[in-house]
Curated annotation (Swiss-Prot):
The lineage of its organism: Bacteria, Pseudomonadati, Aquificota, Aquificia, Aquificales. It comes from the Bacteria. Its EC number is 2.3.1.191. The active site is at 233 (proton acceptor). InterPro entries: Hexapep, LpxD, Trimer_LpxA-like_sf. GO terms for cellular component: membrane. The gene is lpxD. The keyword Cell division does not apply. Belongs to the transferase hexapeptide repeat family. LpxD subfamily. CDD domains: LbH_LpxD. This is UDP-3-O-acylglucosamine N-acyltransferase. Catalyzes the N-acylation of UDP-3-O-acylglucosamine using 3-hydroxyacyl-ACP as the acyl donor. Is involved in the biosynthesis of lipid A, a phosphorylated glycolipid that anchors the lipopolysaccharide to the outer membrane of the cell. Homotrimer.
Amino acid sequence: METTLGEIARIIKGELKGNHNIKIKGISTPENPKENTVVFCRNMEEVEKAKEKASAVVTQEEVKDFPHIKVKDVKLALAEFLEHFFPEEHPWGFLRTPASEKELEIGMGSFIGDFVVIGKNVKIGRNVKIYPFTYVGDNTVIGDNTVIFSGVHIYRNTVIGRNVRIHSGAVIGADGFGYHITQEGIKKIPHIGGVIIEDNVEIGANTTIDRALIENTLIGKNTKIDNLVMVAHNCKVGENNILVSQVGLSGSVKTGKNVILAGQVGVADHVEIGDNVIVTAKSGVANNLAPNKTYGANLPAIEWSRWKRIYVYLLRLPELFKKITT
């Protein structure tokens, strides 16, 4: 994209403070601002980060001596910006072109099974195996020696490294769960980012890894992900992680190196987990976890009649505590 700050202000119905003719060539994030881009900021801390490189910001605040567009609702403005400048494209008509007849880059020794559908501008390395009924979206890159089993769905703008194994039913790069509640209803926030899966990663059956809002959801090298794991948009999973079945990572979670999340661990959005952390099964992680420790908070099953008695006492704890302290 290439536009002006004035045109952006018109599209998102904001109040422009600065030169209308500033050239804008894209969007970036407060964490990673880039030159010639606009950044949508939720607070002044993000504004200060964005000012280091970005050409302008969109914010609810007044910003001194820096080009900005002032809006009432930053999330709504972001959704309107993405809808206008990055519209979702869909084909029309009947497309029956087999993968073998498309202009693809396919390395020596690779195999593409029956009923595989491959989009445009896809690059496939050497000795890659793609089994039947798999979908590979536009602008995807697949590294050498990677194996993709039957029925995998890989959305556009996905980068898969070397020696990766993706099992049946996995979905890579679906839209992140991003919505904003307005007076008119629930507004979808378009996701224009992608997914990067580094070398030597294994992804289990029916696992889902969502695309990022603007940049990339990342799975670090040598990480192993079990079946039925959910990785939400903007997550950064570190190297050598183990994510056991039914783990759920909310949006923008970051994990360090050598992290182990046991079965059914749930992690709240924007939480950071340090290196060498182990979280025991069924634990909920609501806050950042310091490195080199084991964490856990779960309730193992006990005899039902006993639990009901304990529960009665739990409800009386505030009353009992008050009696003890007075």
